[in-house]
Amino acid sequence: MVLNWRFALSADEQRLVREIISAATEFDEVSPVGEQVLRELGYDRTEHLLVTDSRPYAPIIGYLNLSSPRDAGVAMAELVVHPRERRRGVGAAMVRAALAKTGGRNRFWAHGTLASARATASVLGLVPVRELVQMQRSLRTIPDPMVPDQLGVWVRTYVGTVDDAELLRVNNAAFAGHPEQGGWTATQLAERRSEPWFDPAGLFLAFGDSSSNQPGKLLGFHWTKVHAAHPGLGEVYVLGVDPSAQGRGLGQMLTSIGIASLAQRLVGPSAEPTVMLYVESDNVAAARTYERLGFTTYSVDTAYALARIDD
C-alpha cells in the first residue's frame, strides 16, 4: 500500500473520501468520522492522509484527517478504511503514520468504539483518554417546556448576524478550554450557519429579563439540529450557559424548550422521533440532568492516545 500526506484534496479526492465514509457508515451503522472532518475536506486547515494500493491508478482505500493542536491541546486524528479493504493493516498503517508525524503526541477518535478499533488500539499500545457519550430519548412523550420567566429570562430564536457577537461570547465562555467547542471564531460560526440543516427557528437564545441583575444580556442558548439523512432524528447540537448564570437551571430550561420544538418538527408517522446529544463521560452532573429528562446511553465514542500522553 502507498500512503500520501496532502495539505489539500482535489474535488475528485474529496468525492472518493466521502464515498468511503458513506460505505463505512452503512457497514458499521456509525459514521467513522465527525461532522468537522467532513467540513474540512474542502479546506487546507488540516492534513489529509490517503492510502491506495501500490498498483497504478489504484483507488483510495483509506483516509485519515489530522487536525492541528488547539491552545495547549494535542492534534486529533480520525480515520476510515473501506469495508472491503479491512484486515489488511490499513488502519494500523495510518495510525503509525500519524504518530510518526506528531512524535506520538496525537489522539485518535474511535466513533462507536467498535471492536476493530479497540483491537487496533491494543496492538499499537494506545489507551482510552477520553469518552464522549451519545444519549437519546424518544420524542413521543415529553414533559412540558419550562417557563422562562420563572428563571428571570426571556427566550427568542436567532434573528441573524446581529446575534453573533453575543453568541460567540457565551459559547467561548461556556466551553473555555474545550477541544472542539471552545475558541470559536466568527468564521467557524458562519460555516455552521451555512450548513443545509441550519434553521434559525431552531436556535434558542435566553436573555436576562427586566427583573434580573443582567437585563438584556445573553445568558445561554440551545442550538438544535435536524438530521435530514436520518428521518425523525434531532439533536441537542450545542447547549451553552454563561458561567455567570450557571446553577440557576437555565440549561435544563433551554433543553426542555429545544426538545419541545424538535418534537413539533419531527413527530410523524414515518419514523420514531428521537432526540440525541453528546456529553463527556466525566461530566457526571450534566449526564444526571439529561437522565432526569429521560435520556439514556446509546453509544460511546472513545479517544485513544499512547499511554504516556495524559494531558
From Swiss-Prot:
Binding-site residues for 1D-myo-inositol 2-(L-cysteinylamino)-2-deoxy-alpha-D-glucopyranoside, renumbered to this chain: 35, 180, 225, 235, 278
Pfam families per UniProt: Acetyltransf_1 (PF00583)
PROSITE patterns the UniProt entry points to: GNAT
Catalytic activity: 1D-myo-inositol 2-(L-cysteinylamino)-2-deoxy-alpha-D-glucopyranoside + acetyl-CoA = mycothiol + CoA + H(+)
Every N-acetyltransferase domain range: 155-311
InterPro entries from the UniProt entry: Acyl_CoA_acyltransferase (IPR016181), GNAT_dom (IPR000182), MshD_Acetyltransferase (IPR050276), Mycothiol_AcTrfase (IPR017813)
Entry keywords, A to Z: Acyltransferase, Repeat, Transferase
GO biological process, one term: mycothiol biosynthetic process
Keyword Acyltransferase (UniProt): yes
Record function comment: Catalyzes the transfer of acetyl from acetyl-CoA to desacetylmycothiol (Cys-GlcN-Ins) to form mycothiol.
Subunit structure: Monomer.
Protein's UniProt name: Mycothiol acetyltransferase
Organism: Mycobacterium leprae (strain TN)
Upper lineage: Bacteria, Bacillati, Actinomycetota, Actinomycetes, Mycobacteriales
